[in-house]
Regions:
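A short beta-loop-alpha structural element at the N-terminal edge
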Residues: 1-8, 144-159
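Conserved GNAT-fold acetyl-CoA-binding loop/helix
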Residues: 3-29, 167-186
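Conserved donor-binding loop and adjoining core beta-sheet/short helix segment
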Residues: 21-86, 208-230
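Short hydrophobic/aromatic beta-strand element in the GNAT-like acyltransferase core
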Residues: 29-33, 195-200, 210, 236
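Acyl-donor-binding surface of acyltransferase catalytic domains
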Residues: 69-142, 292-300
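Conserved acetyl-CoA-binding loop-helix of GNAT-fold acetyltransferases
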Residues: 73-90, 236-239, 245-258, 262, ...
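Conserved hydrophobic beta-strand within the GNAT/NAT acetyltransferase core sheet
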Residues: 101-103, 234, 268-272
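Conserved active-site alpha-helix within GNAT-family acetyltransferase domains
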Residues: 107-123, 250, 262, 273-292
């Protein structure tokens, strides 16, 4: 089966499974792999010390992008994975927990994922999408939501850092020595924008939660993952441990969603750790659903 036919069948299938998926483009530059009804490209990403992205990704990542056709897509993906893992195994130190093999797939295109499970991959994170107007309950009474200011930088950074630390055991995020500075710099950037993008929740005059968002053009990097004219991105929502489950997160989400909807954005995107027992049920209760799922094997080789 020629590559163009594989890509066309792949695009038709994933498009039918989820209308919010963008049409798959041509495979990017990299090392090409092929089997009878499958095509893939692999590339290596190294994040040097000091780079902000090291908080969100392993330092050394081998990635695979696939196009699948035919009826036995699990078998096709399995054959591509075997080629790929055989290709990269001599480039990875066994047991290097700062290395990973990563495959991102449309969340609703599920038939082939058993091939990943059988090779030790786990679904670690999701890029979730919310269409405008969708949401859950308004949140608890007695919670004040206010825009953060430069005077709130320290408490906002600590709240954001708490979210990162809580998500770290689930496999994708890695707190580094530089993480606090990375988060602080991100908040400084957001706080310096002309419109409020960071909000704090207060209860009994105490800061108990944070949410921050990105609007276009800052959020355009995320918008490439969804079939929409424009997209906002919800970067962080966190509530102090003693207040979780009390409606503060819902109040923060409702406020952020009102701002995003008022901006005329058809969709909002966010990343969350799939195994997080708080974030997964919470986000889907306030209008999100999975769009892309990241499957990871970390370390890449044991």
């Amino acid at each position: 089966m020629d590559p163009a036919a594989i890509t066309a069948e792949h695009a038709a299938r994933v498009g039918a499974s989820d209308p919010l998926l963008p049409a798959p483009g041509r495979l990017r530059e990299g090392t090409r792999l092929s089997v009878d009804r499958g095509e893939a490209v692999t590339w290596f990403q190294h994040l040097p010390v000091g780079l902000a992205a090291r908080t969100w990704e392993p330092a050394r990542t081998h990635r695979l992008d696939v196009r699948l056709a035919g009826e036995d897509r699990a078998g096709t993906l399995g054959a591509l994975l075997d080629q790929w893992l055989d290709l990269i195994k001599d480039t990875v130190a066994p047991g290097d927990t700062d290395s990973a093999a990563v495959v991102e797939l449309p969340s609703r295109d599920t038939e082939a994922v058993s091939a990943l499970v059988h090779r030790g991959f786990v679904p670690s994170s999701v890029l979730a999408v919310r269409q405008t107007g969708r949401g859950g309950q308004a949140g608890a009474p007695g919670v004040r939501i206010r825009a953060a200011t430069a005077d709130d930088l320290a408490v906002a950074t600590e709240l954001n850092l708490t979210v990162v630390r809580f998500d770290a055991p689930f496999g994708k995020i890695t707190p580094r020595e530089s993480t606090e500075e990375v988060l602080r710099n991100q908040l400084v950037f957001l706080l310096n924008q002309p419109e409020p993008l960071v909000w704090l929740a207060e209860r009994d005059h105490r800061v108990v939660g944070i949410v921050h968002i990105q609007l276009p053009p800052v959020s355009d990097w995320a918008g490439r993952s969804v079939a929409a004219a424009a997209a906002g991105y919800l970067g962080c929502l966190g509530v102090v441990e003693s207040e979780r489950g009390g409606g503060i997160g819902a109040a923060l989400a409702a406020h952020a969603h009102a701002v995003l909807d008022a901006a005329g954005l058809p969709v909002t995107l966010l990343h969350h750790a799939l195994a997080n027992p708080y974030s997964t049920p919470f986000w889907y209760s306030v209008g999100y659903r999975p769009l892309w799922t990241t499957w990871i094997r970390r370390p890449a080789f044991g």
